[in-house]
Every structure is written in structure tokens, then in C-alpha cells.
Regions:
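Active-site region of glycoside hydrolase catalytic domains
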Residues: 1-110
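Substrate-binding clefts and catalytic carboxylate motifs of secreted carbohydrate-active enzymes
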Residues: 66-232
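Terminal connector regions
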Residues: 271-275, 406-445, 499, 521-541
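Intrinsically disordered, low-complexity Pro/Gly/Ser/Thr-rich segments with frequent PxxP/GP/PP motifs
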Residues: 236-238, 242-274, 404-409, 497-525
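Short acidic, flexible loop segments centered on an aromatic residue
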Residues: 228-247, 477-496, 537-539
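Disordered, acidic Ser/Thr/Pro-rich linker "stalks" and the adjacent N-terminal cap
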Residues: 274-324, 333-342, 348, 358-365, ...
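Low-complexity, acidic Ser/Thr/Pro/Gly-rich terminal tails and inter-domain linkers that flank the onset
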Residues: 196-224, 228, 245, 434-466
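Short beta-strand-plus-loop segments that form exposed binding edges in beta-rich domains
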Residues: 382-390
Length: 541
């Protein structure tokens, strides 16, 4: 349910005079002056409208997910309108789209707002994110299937990005929009036929009152407690699994913590480069751009955050290892604002520097620089000339010894978070797919076929209306991970989906031997003969 309702004088504008003055006076007179009059829905202290297209997840965690005409000084702030393109499931798509227009995308898609008619939903970027992330679709069914993963990831990140900054400079977020009143391919959580899209499930997970989450920007894990109750003795756990379902124990983290009411509480960082000597140390810089993070953002083992300098040639950043260590490889992961030329220097006291490397024609991107092993405490990147007008910007500044260990993680791997109370009861869980190459999840297509066992029963529920509930247990009985399992209740009589229906979960992932209890509740009149079937389809079907 919404936690707040906002009534404004005008949408994305101010009421024409004299209406604005009359509204303000009426509120003062008839509401006793106890309400604040917000004349404009996206200005006057708010952070704007939009964007309305799906971005890669780290965008929502990084300074700043800009809105139109808002107050940028307020950062994340209170965003009254933001959303993404949301393609529905194939079952809904085929109900409104003529078959001759199914594939490939054509002008008929534009009539359903996937084109110039809703250009600000960024349909081309949405298409590109599907292809980059999950591979070129083989047809419309494959397109809609992969689209749900984009819907989940972008919409969950949108809310979690705000929660990550809760009460720092983030105070609220409202989705444009809950549901489209027309069969549409954008801006909806449940579609025209009341089917629950991936966007719904991403947002539902993020909006748990007590919630554990991972940041795409800096790999931090936090507990978000939006209740008014202090929680004591919680246990937060993070586990990482390869595509084959094997737990990678070296990345496991756990901590016992208290979560104060109405606050985010830090748990730990996940370090995916465990032999990076710079991780967790200190970094210092000549300047910091207002649009990026502090120097430490370049040594947080995440390419979702970055340090950036002011736009001057003679800028620098250095890492303090705390004590001398042997360095043999230096990795610089440049953002688009990279150096044209720079030097690498070392020091034992941060005052007297010795040059060990220079690059007069830097192309940006990821540079892995092998040097003759040297023992030092401080390592500096000294800019000589900027390649752009934006100064220098680094996602990561990594330092390694003689033998940089090859990653033991599969190209795509899974992060599983759990939060338990002091008695061991599960309060929150969360699940992410992560890639060694940001945004590239095509390795998911190599998953072996999953094998599931499904049992279910139908029960009547009359405690709050005449309802029926399908209670199902879905178990992974095969050796493979069952990824993004989609469950749909269907009437046996006509093959139509039972909609509208409320469910506790969907698009969930089961490791070997795991099971999930699913409840699907709907009005009894939608299934008068009690005959149904369950469609249970994993991504790796």
C-alpha cells in the first residue's frame, strides 16, 4: 500500500494566477493552516520528474539519478514521478497485439507507447539492455521472458537506490505509474489485464518494511528498517553462488546487528576482488567533483561508484595502504572522463614521489599495468592532461601483488541475502544475479535445464470476502539452479489466466533441494468449478 499521498496544485507546473493564490489561501483558511501547500509536483524543494526509462541498476545508487526541473542540490530527495518501460508477459502481449505485428518491433508497438509516442520511456535503451544483458531475443516469447528480468532488476534498484540513502538526502519515491489504463508496453507494475509484471515483483521486494539489500554502486549490504520499532540482535548473512549452484565460501559474510527504527543500518561490504590490496584502505585526492563520490569510491571494489576530480589537468588521487606492501600490478578502471596522459608514482611518506610508469596516449577503459615488483606504502595517479572537459574519473584504482589471483566466480553468479531475528526467524531475504562484466548476464543462458516438482491444493477463504487460495509447494529436485521461476494459475475450462490474483512471490530462484511455498488468492467467482492448473516455468526451462 502507498505510505503517503501527495496532492499538488498542478502537475509539473504551477497553477495559473490567480488559482495558485486562491488555493494557498483556501488551505490556510479551511484547513486551519496545518497542511503544507505544494503548488508544483516536481519543484519547490522536490527533485523533479523522471527519468522514465530503465537504466542499469547502479544508476539509481550513484550521484545523482537526475530528474527534470527538480532541485539538484537536494540529491535523491523526494521524487514524485519516476518510472521505466515495462513490457508485459507474452500471455498479455498476445491479447492486444495483432499476430502480424508480434515480431520484430514495428509501428504498432509505437501505438502501444513503445516508440516515439513515449520516447521518454527510452524503448531503444530498453531493447539494448535486453540484448546486452540476456542475449538477442529469438522471437517475441523470448523477448517478453527476458524483459521481465530487466523489469525486476531496474525497478527494484530504483527503490533500493533511494532506500540506500534514506534520510541522508533521500526521503521518498513515487512510481509513474502503478497501472496503465490502456494495453501498454511502458509504465506499469501490473498490466491492463491485472497480470503482475517483473516491475511489480522488484518493487514489492524492495518495499518490505524490514528489508536487507545490496548496493550495485559500492557492494555494501544494509538493513532498511522503515518501521517504528527498534530491532535488536538481528543476524545478516550474505552468500555467493556460482552458476552451478556451488557456494563460494570465501565471499560469505555475516554479522549480528541492531536496526534502529526508521533508519538504514550498515552490515558489511562484499569484496569480489579479495586480493585487491587497495580495498578498504584510505584514498586522498586533489579535488572531488560534486557529481561523484569521495576518493574512497575508487577503492571500494565496485565499478558502480566512482571518484571524479574537478575539470583541471593537474589533478591527482593516491592510495594509502597503511604500511608498505609489494605491488606488481596496478589496475585503473576509467569512466568516460579519462586521462589523455598521466603518471603513476610511489612514495614511502606521501611527500616525496618517484615515477614508475607514464602513459602519453591513454584510451580509457580498464588498464592493467604490470610493473617491476616494488615495495611501497603510497601509490598515486597524477594527471597530466584530461581527455575530456570533465576532469578525471575512476571507477576503480586497484593494487595487486606479484600474483593476481584469477577470479573463481563464474561469469554470472548469485548473491543471496538473509536477515533473521534474534530467535532465528526469517525477516527478509533478497536475491541478485551479478556479472563480472556489469550488465552482461548472457551466461544465464548456459544454465542446465531445471527440474521442478509441484504440489498444490485449493482452499476456500472467507475471513475477508469470498476468496479461493491455491497453495503450492515448488521444489527444485534437479542438480541445476532453477532460475527466475514464473508461476501462473490458469483455469482448466478455458485456458485463461486467473486474474486478478494476489501472490506472495514470483520469479524466484531455487538452489538444489530448495523449495518455495506459494499462495495465489483470487475471488471465488473467477474459478466456479474449482478446476485449475499451474504453469510453473523457470528461465532455464
Amino acid at each position: 500500500h502507498p505510505s503517503i499521498a501527495v496532492w499538488c496544485g498542478d502537475n509539473e507546473s504551477n497553477p495559473q494566477p490567480p488559482l495558485e493564490g486562491w488555493m494557498a489561501e483556501n488551505i490556510r483558511t479551511f484547513d486551519g493552516g496545518d497542511r503544507y501547500f505544494q503548488a508544483n509536483s516536481h519543484a519547490q524543494g522536490l527533485t523533479g520528474s523522471g527519468p522514465w526509462g530503465a537504466f542499469e541498476p547502479r544508476f539509481y545508487f550513484t550521484k545523482y539519478p537526475d530528474g527534470l526541473e527538480g532541485d539538484p542540490a537536494r540529491g535523491w530527495g523526494f521524487r514524485t514521478e519516476i518510472g521505466t518501460a515495462v513490457v508485459p508477459t507474452f500471455e498479455s502481449f498476445k491479447k492486444f497485439m495483432p499476430k502480424e505485428n508480434w515480431w520484430p518491433r514495428d509501428e504498432m508497438w509505437n501505438k502501444h507507447y513503445f516508440g516515439q509516442n513515449a520516447f521518454n520511456a527510452a524503448p531503444d535503451r530498453y531493447d539494448a539492455s535486453i540484448t546486452k544483458g540476456f542475449g538477442k531475443p529469438e522471437g517475441i516469447e523470448d523477448y517478453c521472458r527476458k524483459a521481465q528480468l530487466v523489469n525486476i532488476e531496474s525497478n527494484k534498484a530504483m527503490y533500493e537506490g533511494w532506500l540506500d540513502r534514506m534520510w541522508e538526502d533521500a526521503s521518498g519515491i513515487m512510481t509513474w505509474m502503478g497501472q496503465s489504463a490502456y494495453p501498454s508496453l511502458v509504465w506499469q507494475t501490473y498490466d491492463y489485464y491485472y497480470d503482475l509484471t517483473g516491475a511489480y515483483w522488484g518493487i514489492k521486494k524492495a518495499c518490505e518494511p524490514v528489508h536487507i539489500q545490496w548496493s550495485y554502486a559500492d557492494n555494501s549490504v544494509k538493513v532498511i528498517n522503515t518501521t517504528l520499532q527498534d530491532l535488536q540482535g538481528l543476524k545478516a548473512t550474505a552468500r555467493v553462488y556460482n552458476l552451478d549452484g556451488k557456494e563460494m565460501g570465501r565471499y560469505t559474510q555475516n554479522v549480528t546487528l541492531n536496526a534502529a527504527a526508521n533508519k538504514d543500518s550498515y552490515c558489511f561490504h562484499l569484496n569480489f576482488t579479495t586480493d585487491n590490496l587497495a580495498f578498504g584502505k584510505k584514498a586522498f585526492a586533489s579535488s572531488v567533483s560534486k557529481d561523484a563520490g569521495e576518493p574512497g569510491a575508487a577503492i571500494d571494489a565496485s565499478d558502480g561508484s566512482r571518484w571524479a576530480s574537478e575539470p583541471r589537468d593537474d589533478e591527482w588521487i593516491y592510495v594509502d595502504l597503511g604500511e608498505p606492501a609489494e605491488i606488481a600490478t596496478i589496475a585503473l578502471n576509467w569512466e568516460a572522463a579519462h586521462a589523455k596522459s598521466y603518471k603513476l608514482l610511489i612514495s614511502d611518506d606521501a611527500a616525496h614521489w618517484k615515477e614508475i610508469y607514464s602513459n602519453e596516449d591513454c584510451k580509457g577503459g580498464l588498464e592493467e599495468i604490470k610493473i617491476k615488483p616494488v615495495r611501497t606504502r603510497y601509490v598515486k595517479m597524477q594527471g597530466v592532461k584530461c581527455a575530456t572537459m570533465w576532469g578525471y574519473s575512476l571507477y576503480e584504482f586497484e593494487l595487486y601483488g606479484k600474483k593476481k589471483k584469477p577470479t573463481d566466480l563464474s561469469p554470472v553468479h548469485f548473491i543471496k541475502l538473509e536477515l533473521n531475528d534474534a530467535n532465528g526467524n526469517l525477516l527478509s531475504d533478497n536475491f541478485y544475479w551479478r556479472s563480472n562484466k556489469p550488465g552482461d548476464y548472457k551466461a544465464l543462458n548456459t544454465l542446465s535445464k531445471a527440474k521442478l516438482n509441484v504440489t498444490s491444493q485449493l482452499v476456500n477463504r472467507t475471513d475477508h470476502g469470498d476468496k479461493k487460495v491455491i497453495k503450492a509447494t515448488i521444489k527444485n529436485v534437479g542438480p541445476s539452479v532453477a532460475f527466475a521461476v514464473h508461476v501462473q494459475a490458469v483455469r482448466s475450462s478455458d485456458g485463461e489466466r486467473i486474474l486478478p490474483a494476489l501472490m506472495n512471490d514470483n520469479y524466484f530462484t531455487l538452489l538444489k533441494g530448495e523449495s518455495k511455498d506459494i499462495e495465489i488468492e483470487f475471488d471465488s467467482e473467477l474459478l466456479p468449478d474449482d478446476n485449475y492448473r499451474l504453469s510453473v516455468i523457470p528461465y532455464n526451462k
